[in-house]
Amino acid sequence: MELNNLKPAEGSKHAKRRVGRGIGSGLGKTAGRGHKGQKSRSGGFHKVGFEGGQMPLQRRLPKRGFTSLTKEFVGEVRLSDLEKLPVDEIDLLALKQAGLIGEMITSAKIIKTGELKRKVVVKGLGATKGARAAIEAAGGSFAE
């Protein structure tokens, strides 16, 4: 086998459709566009969503909802994530610097997933009942 003998598999390649090249090709004269009408003309097509003058679906349906400007972005942090943190005082800034929550987050809540075996002081963060109990059981505390 040499490079000059390589051929693609039978039927894997298709010849490009050459339209408007005589009646013998089967795609001559009107080139598969039919007779007359907007879609047969060059440059003749409608914009996306145009329904022939009928009120389009996007305008028939009512507008709904709005974007709240006062929306709070609340992040969730697992106990197992707190275990990996190198600091003992945990607040929103420490979580952001560790990359556990995004920059847009304005408040965070600790959830009881995983285990916490070391003593930590949590400042200004919320926690579920189970997470609070687990932190206090490990000798940690909450400073509001």
Swiss-Prot record:
Pfam families from the UniProt entry: Ribosomal_L27A
One GO process term, biological-process aspect: translation
Signal peptide: none
Disordered as annotated region, ranges: 1-57
GO CC annotation terms, alphabetical: cytosolic large ribosomal subunit
Annotated transmembrane regions: none
GO function term, MF aspect, one: structural constituent of ribosome
InterPro entries: Ribosomal_uL15, Ribosomal_uL15/eL18, Ribosomal_uL15/eL18_sf, Ribosomal_uL15_bac-type
Chain intervals with Gly residues compositional bias: 21-31
Keywords attached to this entry: Ribonucleoprotein, Ribosomal protein, RNA-binding, rRNA-binding
Domain of life per record: Bacteria
Subunit field text: Part of the 50S ribosomal subunit.
Family: Belongs to the universal ribosomal protein uL15 family.
General function of this protein: Binds to the 23S rRNA.
Name recorded for this polypeptide: Large ribosomal subunit protein uL15
Organism: Paraburkholderia phytofirmans (strain DSM 17436 / LMG 22146 / PsJN) (Burkholderia phytofirmans)
Recorded name of the encoding gene: rplO
